[in-house]
């Protein structure tokens, strides 16, 4: 189902949600569906994580902030008609930070896919993945914090928002149609 999208201006589709909320699954599906380039904080920061030992939480956050800056630098240097998929938990920094990066990167249109997830499901998914995560990511001690985060997290709302209920099976066709209509 590879479809071509055009927006006529620099556009980002933010795939947003707390850790373990399903962002990567949706990002990969949309990239395959529309043939769009994607950028993720983890894919940028994890190659650097293997270069260091004993990555603590503050250093992990520094790497995340640097990866975030790389994302917006790449988007800022891209042609004006590119549509980017950006997979991140955008709530890890103030909303104003994202607003500044969007402006500096020359983004004219923002669409957001919000991954709504219950605290219980987020914790369960994160716990299941602990043994597969690169060293340096928060471990089991993060689970109570993640539960609180999932309870209060909200979308950024810089443009139209499509909410994916992670308690339900993903309807990629419905989501794809919404994106086509929204960007059309």
Regions found by a protein language model. Give the residues of each.
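Walker A/P-loop
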Residues: 24
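P-loop (Walker A) phosphate-binding loop of NTP-binding proteins
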Residues: 18
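Small-molecule kinase domains that catalyze NTP-dependent phosphoryl transfer to phosphate-bearing small molecules
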Residues: 131-175
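Conserved phosphate-donor/acceptor-positioning beta-strand/loop module used by diverse small-molecule
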Residues: 105-127
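Glycine-rich phosphate-binding loop used to anchor ATP phosphates in small-molecule kinases
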Residues: 63-107
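Conserved substrate/cofactor phosphate-moiety recognition/catalytic segment
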Residues: 28-76
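Hydrophobic anchor at the beta1->P-loop junction of P-loop NTPases
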Residues: 15
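ATP-binding Walker
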Residues: 21
